[in-house]
Curated annotation (Swiss-Prot):
It catalyses: D-mannitol + NAD(+) = D-fructose + NADH + H(+). Transmembrane segments: none annotated. PROSITE patterns: MANNITOL_DHGENASE. InterPro entries: 6-PGluconate_DH-like_C_sf, 6PGD_dom2, Mannitol_DH, Mannitol_DH/Oxidoreductase, Mannitol_DH_C, Mannitol_DH_CS, Mannitol_DH_N, NAD(P)-bd_dom_sf. Monomer. It holds the Pfam family Mannitol_dh. The lineage of its organism: Bacteria, Pseudomonadati, Pseudomonadota, Alphaproteobacteria, Rhodobacterales. This is Mannitol 2-dehydrogenase. One of its GO terms (molecular function) is mannitol 2-dehydrogenase activity. Keywords: NAD, Oxidoreductase. It comes from the Bacteria.
Length: 477
């Protein structure tokens, strides 16, 4: 190793586990584990180390890789001013990944474990299209039929909670660290929903006794590939699973931990009952901002996000739409300047070291638009204004879903509903109202005549003149 690598300054052998974390991926290792590493470096919380765990084959591969390096994770911050590398030592073990999750259940039953945290991805919570828990999913049905041999994280959590209840041990707190709104509520619905399928008494006990705090997490963390491994080698580290990330990180969470928690407020975590306000700010400004730059960039054949932000038309379009149509409808956030948050987001989007792609930002628009863009559309209309920038964005999304860029490059399928979207975009070219008629995206907004007229004009202009020309005209207005 070289001197430029920061290593744990505390005695890792003195750590004892207080947290089981299910789903040890890149985000967890660049986020929760880093915060705990910082806390341990202060000489505090040494009984809150992490035991890694997982329920999928990919978790077994991660366990093998980390075990070979004493469960240390290399985390490289991609700051344009210079990369920084550290070895994070907050994890002291990684449980065997087993089909019946016996080792995981046993570990979570240990009274020393007071928090079970999860990063199982947004799609790992067994919800249906409406966002409700889906009791008919085959994995859930199987766990309900064989609760002593669960295959899912939620089945294992329930088995451990039942063991703790029967032994008179205080239940652990279940803490989702996934990037989805109301993640505590979603997790509670999954755990209780599964319990109700096979043990109503256990379900009632979980409802009454187990805490599921909501939290907002944020840090851009790319997938690991050859480039990331090369970066680690540049620091003298032969790590097959290094993590790269942006310098920025944020964690906002409800202070609802009946079994206790580490003092993470000492290392920058915000504990507040107002998590929803922070979520709304992030969803409207960051996630909504991603959508604003995604589709015009893609139509203009700009492939990288930082390159899009370096294009004066794209950057100006983002800023104008945010300031005039999104920010005015973001509810106040405690101790936060909304304009300063926008400045931060624009800076993060512009980081050339991250190499995020516009195609990733365009992904899954049929699910993202209703969450990230349509609420701002509605708020503007309710205030008596037609948000021309957001309407133009909707037209650009429609044009993108037609399946070609302005130069004629074919857009590969980029949405779970791509075929249906492409068919509708083709019909909308002649009849723009077809696009707004997607009630699963726009609800009843098609009935707003002013919106419908503005959308029709915008889509016609996009087809006639192309994305670059319509952005230039919009910005000149």
């Amino acid at each position: 190793m070289t001197r430029s690598v920061t290593r744990p300054s505390y005695d890792r052998k003195a750590l004892t586990p207080g947290i089981v974390h299910i789903g040890v991926g890149n985000f967890h290792r660049a986020h929760q584990a880093v915060y705990l590493d910082d806390l341990f470096a202060l000489g505090e919380g040494h009984d809150w180390a992490i035991l890694g765990a997982g329920v999928r084959p990919t978790d077994a591969r991660m366990r093998e890789a980390l075990a070979a390096q004493d469960n240390l994770s290399t985390v490289i911050e991609l700051d344009p001013a210079g990369h920084r590398a550290r070895q994070v030592g907050a994890m002291v073990g990684f449980l065997p990944v087993e089909a019946d999750n016996a080792a995981l259940i046993e570990a979570m039953s240990d009274p020393r474990i007071r928090i079970v945290s999860l990063t199982v991805t947004e799609g790992g919570y067994y919800v249906d299209a409406s966002g409700a828990f889906d009791p008919t999913h085959p994995d859930i049905v199987a766990d309900a039929a064989h609760p002593a041999r669960p295959a899912t994280a939620f089945g294992a959590i329930l088995a451990a909670l039942r063991a703790r209840r029967d032994a008179g041990v205080t239940p652990f707190t279940v803490m989702s660290c996934d990037n989805l709104p109301g993640n505590g509520h979603v997790t509670r619905n999954a755990v209780v929903g599964l319990a109700e399928l096979y043990d109503a008494e256990l379900a009632g006990w979980v409802k009454a006794q187990v805490a599921f705090p909501n939290g907002m997490v944020d840090r851009i963390t790319p997938a690991t590939g050859p480039h990331e491994r090369e970066l680690a080698q540049g620091f003298g580290l032969a790590d097959p699973v290094p993590v790269t990330c942006e310098p920025f990180r944020q964690w906002v969470i409800e202070d609802h931990f009946p079994a206790g928690r580490p003092a993470l407020e000492k290392v920058g975590v915000t504990f507040t009952p107002h998590v929803h306000a922070y979520e709304a700010m992030k969803i409207r400004i960051l996630n909504g901002g991603h959508a604003v730059i995604a589709y015009p960039s893609a139509l203009m054949d700009i492939q990288l996000v930082h390159a899009a932000m370096a294009h004066p038309l794209i950057a100006a379009f983002l800023h104008k739409v945010e300031v005039e149509e999104i920010l005015p409808h973001v509810p106040p956030v405690p101790d936060t300047s909304i304009p300063d948050y926008l400045t931060l987001i624009e800076s993060r989007f512009s980081n050339p070291e991250i190499a995020d792609t516009t195609r990733r930002l365009c992904l899954d628009g049929s699910n993202r638009q209703p969450k990230f863009i349509v609420p701002s559309l509605r708020d503007n209309l309710a205030a008596g204004t037609v948000p021309k920038g957001l309407v133009l964005l909707s037209a650009l999304w429609c044009r993108y879903c037609f399946g070609t860029t302005d130069s004629g490059v074919v857009v590969e399928p980029n949405d779970p509903n791509w075929t249906a979207l492409q068919d509708r975009a083709r019909r909308a070219k002649e009849t723009p109202a077809e696009w707004l008629a997607m009630t699963e995206v726009y609800g009843d907004l098609a009935q707003n005549d002013l919106l419908a007229a503005e959308f029709a004009a915008a889509l016609e202009a996009v087809w006639r003149d192309g994305a670059e020309a319509v952005l230039r005209r919009f910005l000149a207005a």
